[in-house]
Amino acid sequence: MLLTELSTARIPEVYRQFAAVVGDGHWKNRVGQLKQKIRGNRFLGQHLQNENALAYQFERLRELTAKFGRIPQWEANNHAIYPAASFAAQVLSIMEVSPRQFAEQLRRRVHGAFKNPDDMRGLRLELSAATHFARRARRLAWPEMTGEGTFDLLVKDVGPHGLAIECKAISEDKGRKIHKREALDFYGLLWPHIQSTIKGLSTGLSAVLTVPGRLPTKHADRLALARQCGAIIFGGRGASLPDGATIRVAEFDGSRLGDIPSTTRPGEVRATIDEVTKTSNRQAMVIGTHAGGALALTVQSGSDDIFMKAVFDRLSDSAKRQLSEDRGGMFLF
């Protein structure tokens, strides 16, 4: 039976069991790899920590266990580790009532989820869906275990043949020509080439790189593009590049950024950045300078993003392959 409630008093023991069954080396190694990547690119820190939040939570629990022999009770009252604790408890509860083959399959899936944020999002969404129906006393089955289909979850007592649930975790990059990680990697390549620009910059300067489709795939080509961008930004005038990319450079009043560093409303931050860069919902970053200025960097594609089309194309394909006319179906994303 899927666990839907967990007391804080049980968190230390739940972690101990989860670490023994899954292996704490999976989150230890993952966090070690992420820290190495962050050391290589200062702009990756927040993004990778957000994308791998559970791995960081589990690693904190591992470190505390190594130091104290078990998780101290005061840490069990820390809300920041509740997502990891609930994930561990639910995975264990499923494995305990599953045939050995399915339990091992789930264990391997958890291993993969620590390596791939998209897989972790998908697995957590399935657990959330299962929790929703379990708390309403519905009878659940996993088609992977029963062979009743290729969808994620079956609610057996809804409708004459049950209700098929298919979960699709949609990331913020869906349908975008420029993904966030790509932009951050490019900013890391650009960083050494904008030092002369930001040194002593006391006003606002916006630089918008527009590529015809996507950023170059080869590292050498991206590095060359970063060098070109750095030189153009330093010159203070926009330019067109032979490959069709363009760079627009313009000054803005730095005071327009206002209280961006202290605001907790993402919508306000996005609106302000869009205003100073004259773009709309693009991958952008603002770097403050010691002289009181700011450099706003934006990477965008000349081709339109197609978020809604990408989502509905995926759902349409999944409906054809995973759902049937004989049983009710539901998508969660």
Please annotate each region the language model reported.
Residues 135-156:
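A short acidic/basic microdomain associated with nuclease active sites
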